[in-house]
Structure formats: structure tokens, C-alpha cells
Amino acid sequence: MTIDLLPGHGVRLPAPLPELRFGLTEAAVRGLLAPHGELLPDGVRNTFVCGCRWALAFQLPGVSVTLCSDDRDRFRGVGVGRNPNDDRPACPVGYHGIDLLGWPANELVEALRAEGLPVPDPAHGTLRLGSLYLSRHPAPRRPSAPGRKPRHEGPFTFDVVFLSERADPSDPSERAEPSDPSEATE
């Protein structure tokens, strides 16, 4: 049961949920999700995302999923965040075959680099790679000793990932294989 982020293409939800391609209308997205109501017990609901004409949200095990549009009313981005209030094991979120959430950030960066992706070092709990953005929820701050500043950022994991439509077609991280080989010629 994996959510696969498909750069330049969209998102493949866990089977039997559908694959959602960037460019779909809100009605098309709702139509694709409607037959799977039993897998989405809290339903698909409207939500607010700044700068989006429409946004939809639903829950999967351990994660919240948000789909949002561009100014042309077309699906343009998917966000997935860990849901700390859900006791179920979280649905993995795959990108180029690598689970993005729940692993130490430095290990995640090494795994992405091993795939040949030009991944920068995470800075201040965030990482941007083309149209992929990862962030963490703010960590509880422990007070520093009086007069001392922390020397470095401690280890952390990412809690939220957002994938938008293709940012740069020449970027190797922006390529994904469609699930239907007939789509490869589009």
C-alpha cells in the first residue's frame, strides 16, 4: 500500500485507488475517487490551499493527502503529510522507488543521490529537488544553556512532501514512468 509520486505525471494512489494525472479537472478527480468511498471512510472533502482554485483532502492510513489545482482549475499538485493522530502504520510515500517519509533526512538524501539525482543537502528542515519539496514539522525546541547557541541541527525526518507539475523538463528527477506503457508516447 504505497503512494507513488510520479514526477511530471501525477500520483499513483494505493490499489485499488486510481492514478491521478496532472491536468485533471476537479470533477474528474472526484469522479475517479467516488467509487472508492469505502477506502476513504472520512470521505473526500474540500480544503483550503493558498493560491489554488480548488483543493481536496482525504485520509489514508497514517497520512493526510491533499490535491490542489492551478489557476486554470487543473490538478497541479499533491501533498502528503504524516498524521500524528492516526495510530495505523503510515502509508509509504514513494519517489523513484524510495520512501520519503519516516527515514532520517541524511539517509534519504544519500539514497536519492545513489539514484543519480542531484539532491542538495537539506537546510533548516527542508529540501527542494525540482518540483519536489520536503519539510518537517517544527521540532520541539530544547532550551540552550544560557549564553550558548546550538552548534548544528540535530538529526530529523521529513513529515510532509509536496509534488507539483513538472518544473524543469530537462531535470532527471522530473522523469517518471507512467503506469500504462501506452502513455509513454504522449
Model-derived regions: residue spans:
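Short helix/turn-capping signatures at newly exposed starts of structured segments
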Residues: 1-171, 180-186
